[in-house]
Amino acid sequence: MALLQISEPGMAPAPHQRRLAVGIDLGTTNSLVAAVRNSIPEALPDDTGRVLLPSVVRYLEKGGRRIGHAAKEEAAIDPRNTIVSVKRFMGRGKAEVEGAANAPYEFVDAPGMVQIRTVDGVKSPVEVSAEILATLRQRAEDTLGDDLVGAVITVPAYFDDAQRQATKDAARLAGLNVLRLLNEPTAAAIAYGLDNGAEGLYAVYDLGGGTFDLSILKLTKGVFEVLAAGGDSALGGDDFDHLLFAHVLVQAGLDAAALAPEDVRLLLDRVRGVKEALSAAQQAQLDVKLSTGEKLVQTITRDTFAALVEPLVQRTLAPTRKALRDARVSAADIKGVVLVGGATRMPVIRDAVEKYFGQPPLVNLDPDQVVALGAAIQADLLAGNRSGGDDWLLLDVIPLSLGVETMGGLVEKIIPRNSTIPVARAQEFTTFKDGQTAMAIHVVQGERELVSDCRSLARFELRGIPPMAAGAARIRVTYQVDADGLLSVFAREQHSGVEASVVVKPSYGLGDDDIARMLEDSFKTAEVDMRARALREAQVEAQRLVEATEAALAADGDLLDASERATVEALVASLRALAPGDDANAIDAATKALAEGTDEFAARRMNKSIKRALAGRKLDEI
């Protein structure tokens, strides 16, 4: 396809200066590393030829550890010290993960991100992920024969700021230079688009082990533009496993709480094997012997499994509908649907996608590898290993709006959701009170109109504002989201030049369904939110006018006779009494009455100020 030429700093001008960079898919179930070799992206195998590395780490006493296949094989005998699906814990707090389905771990009550107690001490998800990333880095350096200059690491499009920051921290801990965090659906589109010369509108349906993303992309002459993104950061293949696990226990008359942790892990592993077998066969047999000596033997059909997981399949279609709506396109406009993630091998998923979009999904690239391959292509570009006609432009988006709290607990959106990144947007605000010398900046994320209904990301203060009349100061607040989707906020008072800033690093991320719930709530409650916003705005304006009028009466009350002053004071009292109420129309009417009732007073104050300014001056001096 014809490709768009762009310039990146540090591009290698000659082949012999080629720098080694890789793409890494840090997955919930499996991870892998890929690189561009001889102009072709390929997944790099380990010394036994296996490409996929199970995302499993087992901690041993005295600092020992097993990573990948060895850890997975020993998970059933030491479940408490063998961490699986750690990606689900990235950027999460203890309260959010303690109820994780059938998790055998001891979670530690520590501030910030969740911690897990092992025989080798307390470990964070960042440390566990770093073990996996370090293993992949070593594999790449052994295969490629040199040190890496950097890596592009993929993350779910619906990962929030905390989860992205945790991923970057894990990479640094693993000794990796992060060239870019790349959204997984976008990486898949790169691999598919460049491989097939595709153009047009495409949907990327990405169902991994622990997350689901749906992105709508427009591919045109080397430009990959993400029109909209939707998803569920706590829905993946693991959830299908747990549903089947629960079904097996019900059929056997067993209670999960009564099972030994090693039996839970063993049974989950065997259930996952049944799920995978049903992708190729109409039925599969579960045959497992528990530590108690009890043997479970069950035959599970593909139809039984499909009926069991139908609610989860429908959960993937809700974000799909939202993404199409946000992109202002219909399912019929989509030229192709790219499947990503091992969970998309399930026939129930492929059938649902085909039915919804009215066309068979595109499956000519390995769904387990396509994300890493796309990341490798992007890494090769960012490392400077490009040649003529080998560039493209990525236009990715943020999944939720970013805003700031204004007077009255309202949210002023600075960057709306589905804005292309990197992006910087600025807006001016002013002071509310006379002589105000500081301003609190409260950064929030979400789609609702009130701060109380959105997620708080960060707070900081701008101090040193010169004392001025209310409304005279000009504070410019700038929001900047980088190519990794990470946010920084800057505030500057325009007259004095005083500045303050914050790099947003929340202690941990959104809850399991918070992002989807935020969007759903914003649609369901739009009318209520707007009424609430109108009321808050009316109350804020009423308070401002009452305070301004009282200050004017204190300063220049002698400009009014007794009758006029009594009228103004009555209007002030009426507005002050109405302001705390919930009748926005009544507050607006009282505000208007006070404003009109003080017009003559304002004119007299203006004349007084003019006379004072002109006193003692001659006409030719003016």
Swiss-Prot record:
Keywords: ATP-binding, Chaperone, Nucleotide-binding. Belongs to the heat shock protein 70 family. The keyword Nucleotide-binding applies. One of its GO terms (molecular function) is ATP binding. The keyword Transport does not apply. Chaperone involved in the maturation of iron-sulfur cluster-containing proteins. Has a low intrinsic ATPase activity which is markedly stimulated by HscB. GO terms for biological process: iron-sulfur cluster assembly. This is Chaperone protein HscA homolog. It comes from Burkholderia thailandensis (strain ATCC 700388 / DSM 13276 / CCUG 48851 / CIP 106301 / E264). InterPro entries: ATPase_NBD (IPR043129), Heat_shock_70_CS (IPR018181), HSP70_C_sf (IPR029048), HSP70_peptide-bd_sf (IPR029047), Hsp_70_fam (IPR013126), ISC_FeS_clus_asmbl_HscA (IPR010236). It holds the Pfam family HSP70.
